[in-house]
């Protein structure tokens, strides 16, 4: 076992390295996200998570707690994304959310309405929670994920924003592949 005089400095260094997320910088999380967005691109994720969402150990996932509700945080994130020309979000929602009963989770109905209003006009996809988590885990092995944790205490309300290219789409890619003589 190494002497404590070697372990303690290493532990302090490791803990301080984990706090380097620019999202926690002065100016608040919104200023930090505004600073990060130009560096992000397609395949990056921004997750707006409920309060029970676990702190993940993957080095590609940066977590910050901002408080507030899912809907108000989502609106702020989407407003910042709308200012970007290089990316556009694809919102992934848990399919389970639509089946959660008000009796089991008081407030879920209003939360659904608030999230739907925040996502009006957005590209929204649904999938089973574990399928979205697998997609996020795979992505975080190669690409950064920003996880914004709220104070929401309702199940299956996390919104997973998968960033896509803002100036290119599937149709254009298909035409390019056809011009190159590639088939699927």
Mark where each language-model region is.
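Long, hydrophobic N-terminal alpha-helical segment
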Residues: 20-71
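Bacterial N-terminal signal peptides
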Residues: 7-18
